[in-house]
Design a protein with these regions (language model features):
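Active-site beta-strand termini and strand-to-loop segments that position acidic
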Residues: 472-474
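Short, charge-patterned binding micro-sites
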Residues: 23-24, 29-30, 58-59, 417-432, ...
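Helix-adjacent hinge/juxtasegments
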Residues: 49-56, 62-78, 82-90, 247, ...
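Nucleotidyltransferase catalytic core that binds NTPs
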Residues: 1-189
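Charged phosphate-binding loop/patch that engages nucleotide di/tri-phosphates or the phosphate backbone
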Residues: 160-189, 350-381, 508-512
Length: 512
């Protein structure tokens, strides 16, 4: 279409403006805007007379064509004597009237439509005449060669052979269209927030740094869904983990000092504590779990939260990372989060030792605490195996927790065996509270009675600040107490009751 428009002689140049946040499409079905922008650049960079403009990437609001045309005029992108022409296929004739203020659009720009070989269908000509009479305009056409290609079909089949080589390479490098898209688990408001953040990051980060941040966000969401924490928090933490990375070093240092005082770490690590401050001040993040995950994404720390582990791993394992063979750690991350973080920390330690560089103290403490936790879990399993007559098994404990929840009026309580799907735990218990107050009361009751009756203390508890989804981790048993809206959205029961399709990219590790 672009080359046809240029050859037609009707235009001097072609501007291609990838949509930012199109109002007529579901956010969950959209590939994140920076991916689409950079992929378009890769596809069109060799076409003379064509330029890709980031106009809709710079505006955080929904992208309406009339507003984009106004921006082009008001910001001087086009000169006062330039004529603006909108180039589309003829299918636009049947959609134009549903757009936001079509009467403005046709006053702001002429319509030049691509016509495939052959005679225009009668219905198309009739619609064109109807629009010309309704709006007092003249619609023009230019010929193009027929191309039998559909973006929807390409995504469905995964056959990218008809795409330009730079686009195929881009898709492969960033794993853009996996069979399972983790972003469908995000709330609509999270998608809107992510686009707002992306427009700011687009101005402040390099192309490669922004793509890395997006990759980290997507992988963080995948791990969050896999290991049972909020994918919305994981998406934000993953996207913003490097938000301060390309600020001036002096500014990074001053921000880091607010968090950790003196002495400051090496310059290469400043962006993590600085990012905690910058994410709060620039992006309005007030969720302490997210801010902590940003702060510790480079080093880890002792007793890391699940979100911190996920962002730490996603930063190191996102698909564009190719500085070493990550196959084994990536495979491990699909099954056992702690063991994957241990393997990653050990790999970093070994690399530093080879360079004769000091292993960061926080990383050392993180590794030690995870190894202790792993040993404790192994010892606990061994002891349980050896003393089954003295200890109640996890199924019996799960049933006891279920009884506590039901006695406290929890709704839709379910027990899900997951030991055959992951090393994370043996069972998930999922329950619903009627309100945030009820959810907090259910959590407190489980914690209190399991301590009194079985001398069991949770390894950690997450979500008490909002009480819309509280996670109580008893190592082999993980209790999820949801607000009804959160449970309906995340559907953990359906996710874990259904076996995950085999991922051909995953290499199985030996049982040892």
């Amino acid at each position: 279409m672009i080359t046809g428009a240029i050859k037609s002689g009707r235009v001097d140049k072609v501007w291609v403006i990838p949509s930012g946040y199109p109002p007529k499409k579901e956010a969950a079905a959209l590939t994140p805007a920076p991916y689409r922008y950079y992929m378009t650049e890769a596809a069109l960079k060799s076409i003379e007379g064509c330029e890709v403009l980031p106009i809709e990437m710079l505006r955080p609001e929904k992208s309406y064509t009339t507003d984009t045309l106004s921006y082009i005029r008001e910001e001087g992108v086009a000169g006062p004597d330039d004529k603006l022409i909108l180039i589309y296929g003829t299918d636009i004739l049947f959609e134009l009237e549903t757009w936001y203020h079509p009467e403005r659009i046709v006053r702001q720009a002429e319509l030049l439509l691509a016509r495939r070989p052959g005679v225009l269908q009668e219905s198309t000509l009739r619609k064109a005449t109807e629009l010309e009479e309704k709006y007092g305009i003249e619609i023009s056409y230019f010929p193009i060669e027929g191309v039998n290609i559909s973006s929807r079909e390409i995504r469905r089949t995964g056959d990218y052979s008809k795409l330009a080589a730079p686009v195929r390479q881009f898709i492969a490098r960033h794993d853009l269209y996996p069979k399972e898209n983790p972003l469908v688990f995000l709330k609509d408001e999270t998608h809107a927030l992510l686009f707002e953040y992306e427009t700011k990051l687009f101005r402040e980060l390099s192309r490669e740094r922004l793509l890395h941040s997006l990759n980290t966000a997507v992988l963080s969401v995948r791990y969050a869904v896999r290991f049972g924490i909020s994918p919305d928090e994981a998406a934000v933490a993953g996207l913003l983990h490097d938000c301060a990375k390309q600020l001036p070093i002096a500014l990074q240092a001053s921000m880091a000092k607010k968090v950790m005082g003196e002495p400051l770490p090496d310059n290469s690590l400043l962006h993590a504590p600085a990012g905690q401050i910058y994410a709060a001040e620039r992006y309005g993040i007030d969720n302490e779990s997210i801010l902590s995950a940003i702060r510790y994404h480079t080093t880890g720390r002792e007793n890391m939260t699940t979100l911190e582990k996920i962002v730490y791993l996603a930063d190191k394992l996102e698909p564009a990372r190719d500085y070493t063979d990550l196959t084994a750690i990536r495979a491990l991350a699909e099954k056992d989060l702690d063991e994957a973080v241990i393997a990653c920390l050990k790999a970093v330690r070994d690399k530093f030792e080879q360079k004769r560089t000091a292993f960061h103290a926080d990383s050392s403490r993180a590794l030690d605490s995870l190894i202790r936790r792993s040993k404790t879990k192994i010892e606990s399993i061994t002891e349980t195996t050896q003393q089954t007559e003295e200890k109640m098994d996890t199924l019996a404990l799960s049933n006891e927790i279920i009884e506590i929840l039901k006695n406290k009026k929890a709704e839709d309580v379910e027990l899900i065996p997951i030991s055959d799907k992951t090393a994370l735990a043996d069972y998930f218990i999922i329950a619903t509270g009627t309100s945030t107050t009820h959810i907090k009361a259910l959590s407190d009751e489980v914690e209190l009675l399991m301590k009194q009756n079985r001398n069991l203390t949770p390894d950690h508890i997450e979500g008490q600040s909002t009480s819309r989804w509280i996670l109580i981790d008893y190592k082999d048993i993980v209790v999820h107490i949801f607000h009804p809206e959160e449970r309906a959205h995340y559907s953990l029961d359906k996710l874990w009751m259904t076996k995950r399709p085999e991922d051909t990219n995953i290499v199985e590790l030996p049982e040892s």
